Amino acid sequence: MSQDNNFSQGPVPQSARKGVLALTFVMLGLTFFSASMWTGGTLGTGLSYHDFFLAVLIGNLLLGIYTSFLGYIGAKTGLTTHLLARFSFGVKGSWLPSLLLGGTQVGWFGVGVAMFAIPVGKATGLDINLLIAVSGLLMTVTVFFGISALTVLSLIAVPAIACLGGYSVWLAVNGMGGLDALKAVVPAQPLDFNVALALVVGSFISAGTLTADFVRFGRNAKLAVLVAMVAFFLGNSLMFIFGAAGAAALGMADISDVMIAQGLLLPAIVVLGLNIWTTNDNALYASGLGFANITGMSSKTLSVINGIIGTVCALWLYNNFVGWLTFLSAAIPPVGGVIIADYLMNRRRYEHFATTRMMSVNWVAILAVALGIAAGHWLPGIVPVNAVLGGALSYLILNPILNRKTTAAMTHVEANSVE
């Protein structure tokens, strides 16, 4: 692989593309995240058995469809999410989604570090701040090696978390006296179904919007759709189930407390640590690509800086986790909606990244994101879905009208350059 093995400033060449199996493990390493188990615990204690599965399957199906669109575009073009955003937002306009997406990934990194350090501190009596510092440093170091390191870590962590989660579910069901007893559990504090759906989608809408950053390494765009669906519909659903079963059986929403109560302290520390490590490295990798789009600096250097920032802010982010998900569920989806909408309208432009003429700032795209956020906040229904559709539809309607002359001029120039 070349020195810039992150390919942060241009398309991934065919020589650096990877097979579907390697990408599937990388994406499962992303979605097999303990945060989904924590959210699953919240749903498991707040929803009935039937409503839990309905919320998880609907929410992750929506996530799978959304990320499949973005994965297809990423694999077809070989471009990062942030370079794709230049087509719709403009070269400097793309700095806004890069800042928003890159910043949230730094936040997720901090949440992940705390999710590992706090239960280990509870169980061992070691200082939590020291654990945060050490684990944050170790997780930051490996991201320097790029997509290859993510693949190796995922090959280890994905089977391990599947085994641990499956065993925890088996203990929970047996401890209750069978599946029928688990089905009969009535939530002490019921959770609104629309809120539950927003939590499911919000749990991975930020990382899901960055699907292109990982799947762009795929050799086949159609298979990239399969990779995204497996990772988000199947992988993320399993993580919710792993978290919910023990939570419902023991009445504890915190997965670390559940694992300790089930006598799984040591394997939980090792396996959940690996699990968080893979997702956190994915988060830092993606954040580096985002800030590289803004600064032009090496994405590897920026990933290390972001790791330090996320480590310092870890405890604050962990303590505001539900609020963080609520923010993400409305603020991030319109960005992906705009990228998808522009590709559907102008897909031929994406074939010539190096020569395509782009606006400096496309204010229509920024307005569409604002309208998408408003749709998510004010319209009834599922917040992230309203936000995606609001952003995409606003862009599809407004961009051809407000940028009619600019779009026509750019199309004319590009047609002549191709000829």
Swiss-Prot record:
InterPro entries, A to Z? CodB, Pur-cyt_permease
**What are the subcellular locations of this protein?**
Cell inner membrane
Mind telling me which Gene3D superfamilies this protein's record contains? Hydantoin permease (1.10.4160.10)
UniProt entry tagged with the keyword Endoplasmic reticulum = no
Stretches assigned to the Periplasmic side: 40-51, 121-127, 173-192, 243-257, 321, 379-380
GO biological process annotations for this chain's record? cytosine metabolic process
Show the GO cellular component annotation of the record.
plasma membrane
UniProt-listed Pfam families: Transp_cyt_pur (PF02133)
Which residues does the entry place in the Cytoplasmic compartment?
1-19, 72-100, 148-152, 213-221, 278-300, 342-358, 401-419
Q: Which organism is it from?
A: Escherichia coli O157:H7
Is Membrane tagged as a keyword? Answer: yes
Q: How does it sit in the membrane?
A: Multi-pass membrane protein
Q: What gene name does this entry carry?
A: codB
One MF term in GO for this entry?
Answer: cytosine transmembrane transporter activity
Q: What does this protein do?
A: Required for cytosine transport into the cell.
Transmembrane segments annotated in the record for this chain: 20-39, 52-71, 101-120, 128-147, 153-172, 193-212, 222-242, 258-277, 301-320, 322-341, 359-378, 381-400
Give the similarity note.
Belongs to the purine-cytosine permease (2.A.39) family.
What are the UniProt keywords, alphabetically? Cell inner membrane, Cell membrane, Cytosine metabolism, Membrane, Transmembrane, Transmembrane helix, Transport
Q: Which domain of life is it from?
A: Bacteria
In Swiss-Prot or TrEMBL terms, this protein is called Cytosine permease
